Amino acid sequence: GGVKGARLGGEPPGTPCVPAEIERLLPESVARDQDTTATRIMDGQGTKTDWLAYQGASYFRTSGALDQYGMSARGLAIDVAMPWPEEFPRFTQFWLEQTEPESSHIVIYALMDSPSVTGAYRFDWVKHGGVVVSIRAELYCRKNIARMGVAPLTSMFWFSETNRHQATDWRPEVHDSDGLALWTGSGERLWRPLNNPPSVRTS
């Protein structure tokens, strides 16, 4: 159903933003005293499927038209596949724009923070069969960043039916996703099957 607005983290205790029907569902410590940077928007009363989910750090995802999860998206990736550890920015605060009950459209604002970057995001979610999200971000770097990934996606892949010879497992395929479907700005549609090489590769 629709969400009228909620304090999902960051504001001082007592900020009058959480409607009673939502606040009753949250543990007292979470609803009033602690930051909450992971949350789910459910399909409606009596369902167990997610409309969308923010999963901590800068991860977010939606289950799509068939209620099947695959890839997760991230707000930002910093120093992926570098000789030093990757940095994981996180969303620290969320705001939900007021919507009508049972609305298929929701707007969420989020602040991001990390040692290297800070920024603000606007997520415009529309559910009509599948889910489409339009994202606008303003990012401010605190220092030089060797490698920054904008609009990164993440998933899990061991092997698929196309490279079954790489595996020593009885199952025909083991993955959350087996390829990347691209719809370019020029209207071209591309399909890139995933692979599991012995070393990191970029393209």
Set out the residue ranges of the language-model regions.
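Solvent-exposed N-terminal domain segments of exported/luminal and surface proteins
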Residues: 1-82
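Short, surface-exposed beta-strand/loop "edge" segments at domain boundaries and coil↔beta transitions
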Residues: 3-8, 116-119, 189-190
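A general structural signal for short secondary-structure junctions and capping/turn motifs
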Residues: 29, 86, 97-100, 124-130, ...
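Extracellular structured ligand-interaction cores
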Residues: 34-36, 91, 103-105, 118-122, ...
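Structured loops at beta-to-helix junctions and adjacent beta-edge loops in soluble globular domains
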Residues: 42, 111-113, 185
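A contiguous, surface-exposed recognition patch within enzymatic or periplasmic domains that forms
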Residues: 52-54, 58-71, 146, 150-203
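Extended, loop-rich substrate-binding clefts of extracytoplasmic carbohydrate-active enzymes
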Residues: 74-128
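Acidic, contiguous internal or C-terminal segments within carbohydrate-active enzymes
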Residues: 110-156
